[in-house]
Amino acid sequence: MANMNALQQMIFPDENAPIHRKKSVTAASVKSKGTVLGQKKPGGARKALNDITNKSGIHAKAAASSKNKQIASAAVKEIDIAGERFLHDHSKCIKEQQNLWDDHYSADLMLLHHGSSIKEKHLNWDIEKMDAKDDLTYEEPEEMASPKFSDWLKNSTPWRSPIRHGSMMPSTPLAWRFDSCEFTLKEDSDDLF
């Protein structure tokens, strides 16, 4: 059967899961110590596989050094907020960021390196455009004849509408068999190749 810890790890973890698990582990260890002391087996506790020593004093020193490391890491994790505010002035940071913005993203960069003269160019162009709108005289477009269309218009054959599908088309392809066709043979010319 699966271990309860393994089942808990399969469930989606939330932020507080490690805290609840640590409390339950410490509560279980307190209960189990009382029962283990009463039912102590001969031969002592089981040793780790990588432990090849026979002395129990080394384990106590290692445990003490690990506790000291945990206390030191907890002290490092504590942050002195008042000291941080004293060492770091946030208003200076804001001013520095604003200066960087002004230096790197100035109007010259935004307006494609044209500088301040770009405003003057736009003003002059707008004035010229307004003057052009005041003078609203446009020439009439001239009609230009196209040689293709003029050739079609000179054609002597009358214009016809396209043939509708059902009106003049023969009903079967066999009706086309009796139409007369004229074929003429042309001499081969070597000039084409």
Swiss-Prot record:
Expression sites (tissue/organ): Expressed in somatic and reproductive tissues. Expressed in inflorescence, young buds, roots and basal portion of young leaves. Expressed in proliferating cells such as apical meristems of roots and shoots, expanding cotyledons and leaves, root vascular tissues, and in stomatal precursor cells.
Alphabetical UniProt keywords: Cell cycle, Cell division, Chromosome partition, Cytoplasm, Meiosis, Mitosis, Nucleus
Induction entry: Cell cycle regulated with a peak at late M/early G1 phase mitosis. Peak of expression during metaphase. Strongly expressed up to mid-prophase I and decreases during late prophase. Not induced by stress.
Annotated localization: Nucleus; Cytoplasm
Keyword NAD annotated: no
GO term, biological process aspect, one: regulation of mitotic cell cycle
InterPro entries listed in its UniProt record: Patronus (IPR039326)
D-box (motif): residue ranges: 46-49
GO CC annotation terms, alphabetical: cytoplasm; nucleolus; nucleus
General function of this protein: Required for the maintenance of centromeric cohesion during interkinesis, until meiosis II. Required for regular configuration and segregation of sister chromatids in meiosis II. Also required for centromere cohesion during meiosis I. Involved in spindle organization at the end of telophase I and in meiosis II. Required to prevent precocious release of pericentromeric cohesins during meiosis, but not for cohesion establishment and monopolar orientation of kinetochores at meiosis I. Involved also in somatic development.
Entry domain remark: The DEN-box is not essential for the meiotic function.
UniProt miscellaneous comment: Patronus is Latin for protector.
Listed name of the protein: Protein PATRONUS 1
Organism: Arabidopsis thaliana
Gene: PANS1
